[in-house]
Swiss-Prot record:
Origin organism lineage: Bacteria, Bacillati, Bacillota, Bacilli, Lactobacillales
One Gene Ontology biological process: translation
Pfam families linked: Ribosomal_S18 (PF01084)
Source organism of this protein record: Lactobacillus johnsonii (strain CNCM I-12250 / La1 / NCC 533)
SUPFAM superfamilies reported in the protein's UniProt record: Ribosomal protein S18
GO cellular component, one term: cytosolic small ribosomal subunit
Protein family membership: Belongs to the bacterial ribosomal protein bS18 family.
Keywords linked to the UniProt accession: Ribonucleoprotein, Ribosomal protein, RNA-binding, rRNA-binding
Function: Binds as a heterodimer with protein bS6 to the central domain of the 16S rRNA, where it helps stabilize the platform of the 30S subunit.
Name by which UniProt lists this protein: Small ribosomal subunit protein bS18
InterPro entries: Ribosomal_bS18, Ribosomal_bS18_CS, Ribosomal_bS18_sf
One function term, GO molecular function aspect: small ribosomal subunit rRNA binding
Assembly notes: Part of the 30S ribosomal subunit. Forms a tight heterodimer with protein bS6.
Length: 78
């Protein structure tokens, strides 16, 4: 027997960066970047955060730069 899917329509996620009119994603803005990494230190995917592809690429570059500069950890401490 085929099972029926439950639940209604999911609300579309809003791009936080576009909604707040952030033009430049600075690698030194650690508070902004922490919104887009998990508690383990991994970069969250677009389907979780709702960012556009363009802003996701900018975020990824900024997070990686912040990691190299020592502002963000590569992995979280246990």
């Amino acid at each position: 027997m085929a099972q029926q899917r439950r639940g209604g329509r999911r609300r579309r996620k809003v791009d936080f960066i576009a909604a707040n009119h952030i033009d430049y994603i600075d690698y030194k803005d650690v508070d902004l970047l922490k919104r887009f990494i998990s508690e383990r230190g991994k970069i969250l995917p677009r389907r979780v955060t709702g960012t556009s592809a363009k802003n996701q690429r900018k975020l990824t570059v900024a997070i990686k730069r912040a990691r190299v500069m020592g502002l963000l950890p590569f992995v979280a401490e246990d």
